[in-house]
Amino acid sequence: TIGQAGIDKVKQVSMWHNNLEGELNESLTLGYRERFPEANDDFFFLSLLHGMELLQGAINTTQSTDPFEIALALEKGSYQGPTGKVWMRKDNHQLLQPLFVSTMVDINDGSIKYDVERTGIGFLTDSTTEADQTIIKTTCSMDRPDS
């Protein structure tokens, strides 16, 4: 473990961390901690929420559970997630979402509200890259079924 040695040195690029601003982000952190009070871990993979929200939107749009119809609807779908706009890229089916660069800090310095895994250390956002700024040319040559 890195622990205290990583304070103000360790950086991460992530899709989410538990000190992002916003009511929904805070409710994700608190909801997880309330549901699993004995666990020394935290909600982390926001992409799971994104996937379910996009799938629900595709099913609602198509009024179907047909995989092909849902796949086509997913390619057109988007939603406003807790960190910003999220959507699936049509040409390679990759999830596009904001990314955050953050620095490991000591919770006692007052710059963050929540630590990670109850360690007394957490992450403070340095910068945000919106989803549309992450798009690069794809080399994907996905072979799609006709139906």
Predicted feature residues:
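Extracytosolic ligand-binding ectodomains
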Residues: T1-S147
